[in-house]
Amino acid sequence: MKQPNYYAIISAEVRYDKNLTPHAKLLYAEITALLNMNGECFATNRYFSNLYSKSVVTISKWISELSANGY
């Protein structure tokens, strides 16, 4: 898979959230970089799985972690 060539920004709120793992923080940045004008991201867990060479289950856990912490 060709790696994307765009910037991802992680807000201070997310960067310093002690409840989030570093992987979840990185995924948050990736998701926000892919948001459209309506604040929607249509990338699938499989997309992120391929991008980071992690299982879909792992990606789902990271997303659940973000969701459980209000992101």
Give short role names for the model-derived ranges.
Residues M1-Y71:
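Short recognition helix of helix-turn-helix/winged-helix DNA-binding domains
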